[in-house]
């Protein structure tokens, strides 16, 4: 557990609820993040603890939570990821992306596949000594892609179609749901 938990009580593992009254759902560009999220991105000390516990990174998926947080900082400051010296996203070379506060995050700063590689297990959040909420930022960006642009990965679209047709993401009828 995080060493800071003793000072502020236990951390919630719940995602922040979606504000359906907001003019835009989710986060499109770095400037759309809340001030405390931006402060968290800037507070990152690049210790790599999030990277070390990330199952997606360990499995070779195109996600590195440490680089993602650094990329959000690049997005707010403007510039490119060429100065990043750590491990990149597996399969995606460093130096391909540029960011600015009012520029769309996907695909200019981060690839959509990077966001969808996250399992939302929150291991990165639990390990972070700076209390950065990696998963909330990822989910906010996914919400924009899904709810504003209508973009979901292929598996996500199948699960949504199954929910509509059968009331469960596996696509099984209620009588056979337990037959796996």
Kindly give the residue locations of the regions a language model identified.
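Membrane-embedded alpha-helical bundles of multi-pass integral membrane proteins
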Residues: 1-27, 70
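Charged, low-complexity, helix/coiled-coil-prone segments
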Residues: 8-18, 55, 156-166
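Short, glycine/proline-biased beta-turn/loop segments that scaffold the active-site neighborhood
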Residues: 72-74
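Juxtamembrane segments of multi-pass membrane proteins
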Residues: 52-55, 63-70
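Iron-sulfur-cluster electron-transfer modules
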Residues: 32-41, 67, 76-180
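Acidic, Ser/Thr-rich low-complexity segments on the non-lumenal side of membrane proteins
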Residues: 15-58
């Amino acid at each position: 557990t995080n060493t800071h938990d003793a000072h502020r009580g236990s951390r919630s593992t719940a995602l922040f609820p979606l504000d359906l009254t907001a003019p835009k759902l989710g986060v499109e560009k770095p400037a759309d993040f809340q001030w405390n999220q931006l402060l968290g991105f800037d507070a990152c000390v690049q210790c790599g603890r999030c990277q070390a516990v990330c199952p997606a990174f360990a499995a070779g998926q195109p996600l590195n939570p440490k680089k993602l947080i650094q990329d959000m900082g690049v997005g707010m400051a403007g510039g490119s990821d060429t100065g990043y010296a750590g491990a990149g996203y597996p399969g995606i070379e460093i130096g391909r992306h540029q960011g600015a506060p009012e520029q769309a995050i996907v695909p200019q700063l981060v690839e959509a596949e990077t966001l969808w590689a996250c399992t939302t297990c929150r291991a990165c959040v639990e390990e972070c000594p700076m209390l950065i909420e990696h998963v909330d930022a990822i989910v906010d960006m996914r919400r924009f892609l899904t709810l504003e642009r209508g973009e979901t990965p292929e598996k996500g679209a199948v699960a949504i179609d199954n929910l509509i047709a059968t009331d469960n993401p596996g696509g099984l009828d209620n009588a056979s749901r337990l037959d796996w």
